[in-house]
Regions:
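Conserved beta-strand-loop-beta-strand hairpin that lines the nucleotide-binding pocket
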Residues: 1, 42-146
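Generic detector of short, locally flexible boundary/turn motifs and exposed helical patches
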Residues: 19-24, 31-36, 84-86, 92-97
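Conserved ATP-binding N-box helix of the HATPase_c
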Residues: 25-52
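Bergerat-fold GHKL ATPase/HATPase_c domain
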Residues: 1-32, 141-146
């Protein structure tokens, strides 16, 4: 499935579509993670420019689900300098120990790395791949005769 929309923070209907094919037991956690990723793409990638779009490809694979989120921004790579993902998120501190003004920077990344089993950016930093493992085998519908 592929979904695209202009940069916006009104994500409720988009999230509903993206969650429609995953087990309900995962909805709350995955909704939070996808919302953070989409807000980052709209706000930081596309600067909330409605003439720029966000594209999401979704696919069940192996024992989980994969989302690839693309924006039309300049690109982002938290690990470009070889930084540890937890060091980048909150400079290695636990979120609860941070001052209020420190919590916004890196909060979305912290959430992504704790919800999804795999988080990767493309070389140009314009695509984010998120993978969530589930406890059962997933068989994409293209393998089944209708």
């Amino acid at each position: 499935m592929t979904v695209s929309f202009p940069s916006t923070l009104h994500l409720h209907p988009i999230l509903d579509v993206l969650l429609s094919q995953i087990p309900e037991s995962c909805h709350s956690e995955v909704r939070l993670g996808l919302q953070e990723a989409l807000v980052n793409a709209a706000k930081h990638g596309n600067n909330l420019d409605p003439s720029k779009s966000i594209y999401i490809r979704f696919r069940p694979i192996f024992r989980g689900y994969c989302w690839i989120i693309s924006d039309q921004g300049q690109g982002f790579r938290p690990d470009r300098e070889g930084a540890d993902r937890n060091a980048y998120c909150y400079n290695g501190k636990e979120p609860s120990s941070l001052e209020d003004h420190e919590r916004d920077c890196g909060r979305g990344l912290y959430i992504l790395y704790h919800i999804f089993d795999q988080v990767e950016w493309s070389d140009d930093g314009k695509e984010l791949m998120l993978y969530k493992r589930t406890s059962r085998w997933i068989f994409p519908s293209l393998f089944w005769n209708s």
